[in-house]
């Protein structure tokens, strides 16, 4: 019953606030678990978290984002001095965990603003930018650049099969950003007039590649053939300890929603995401700065030390 209320709370966070990322909703939900916890040992608390994370991954939200956010939340929150862990009163340990969790979430909430500020370094006036799919951090980055006085023209792919690009198109138009909506199959045609590709990521892999909305790899391959830089805007909470080398290496739970997997007929289904290898990416723009794709593995090591 408690777990059902937690999952309901998670869904509510995303449904009531369209601007909230799956990653942020995940860590806020795990904080609720921590606040309610009456665990008396580290193992008992970890078991509580693991059960909730497993339930979150069975929702139809991005399993990639849930996995990475939960892993980093657990890692950051559960660091505690050995002397404190040896005490009989585990409530003091939980209090420290709660304090660290709130600090972690505060940093996550400020991630997009840091990315937007960093990304300005790569914009020029009268720049043509191409973006694919609906990424909240990419949208905020473009709007921030527009408000800062950059004159940009944004080309947005439809991003089928759910046409999520149309949401980006409408949002940019509403905010006065010159925007053109193009067919996914038109990317090769328009690329010759594009100065930069800007995409988000559901997950940044240990390889330095990204998992993102289906069609992203097509856009990035075409961009490289035209010598157009590809910038990935992604919070470090989306860094994942996975090492795919090709499409076949993507975990099944990343490729398909749970409801699709449960139908047990994946041969008839299209994957939601694809993998773009690091050689097709120029920079990963994050809340800790811009980095080359090959630096992601080192950054992950720092996070988990």
UniProtKB/Swiss-Prot annotation:
Acts as a component of the translation initiation factor 2B (eIF2B) complex, which catalyzes the exchange of GDP for GTP on eukaryotic initiation factor 2 (eIF2) gamma subunit. Its guanine nucleotide exchange factor activity is repressed when bound to eIF2 complex phosphorylated on the alpha subunit, thereby limiting the amount of methionyl-initiator methionine tRNA available to the ribosome and consequently global translation is repressed. Coiled coil: none annotated. It is found in: Cytoplasm, Cytosol. GO terms for biological process: cytoplasmic translational initiation; translational initiation. Signal peptide: none annotated. Keywords: Cytoplasm, Initiation factor, Protein biosynthesis. PANTHER family: TRANSLATION INITIATION FACTOR EIF-2B SUBUNIT ALPHA. Belongs to the eIF-2B alpha/beta/delta subunits family. It comes from Caenorhabditis elegans. This is Translation initiation factor eIF2B subunit alpha.
């Amino acid at each position: 019953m408690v777990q059902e209320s937690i999952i309901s709370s998670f869904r509510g966070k995303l449904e009531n606030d369209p601007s909230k990322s799956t990653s942020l909703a995940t860590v806020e939900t795990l904080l609720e678990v921590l606040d309610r916890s009456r665990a008396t040992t580290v193992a008992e608390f970890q078991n509580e978290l693991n059960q909730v994370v497993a339930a979150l991954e069975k929702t139809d939200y991005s399993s990639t984002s849930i996995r990475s956010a939960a892993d980093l939340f657990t890692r950051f929150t559960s660091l505690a001095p050995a002397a404190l862990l040896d005490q009989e009163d585990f409530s003091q340990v939980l209090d420290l965990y709660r304090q660290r969790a709130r600090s972690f979430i505060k940093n996550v909430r400020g991630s997009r603003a840091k990315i937007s500020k960093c990304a300005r370094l790569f914009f020029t006036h009268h720049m043509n930018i191409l973006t694919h799919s609906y990424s909240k951090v990419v949208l905020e980055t473009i709007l921030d650049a527009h408000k800062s006085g950059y004159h940009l023209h944004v080309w947005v792919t439809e991003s089928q099969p759910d046409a999520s690009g149309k949401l980006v198109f409408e949002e940019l138009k509403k905010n006065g950003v010159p925007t053109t909506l193009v067919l996914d199959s038109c990317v090769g045609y328009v690329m010759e007039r594009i100065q930069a590709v800007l995409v988000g990521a559901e997950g940044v892999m240990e390889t330095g590649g990204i998992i993102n909305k289906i069609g992203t790899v097509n856009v990035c391959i075409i961009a490289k053939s035209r010598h157009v830089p590809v910038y990935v805007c992604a919070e470090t909470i989306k860094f994942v300890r996975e090492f795919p080398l090709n499409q076949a290496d993507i975990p099944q739970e990343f490729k398909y929603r749970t409801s699709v997997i449960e139908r047990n007929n994946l041969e008839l289904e299209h994957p939601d995401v694809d993998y773009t290898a690091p050689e097709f990416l120029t920079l990963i723009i994050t809340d800790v700065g811009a980095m080359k794709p090959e630096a992601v593995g080192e950054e992950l090591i720092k996070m988990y030390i």
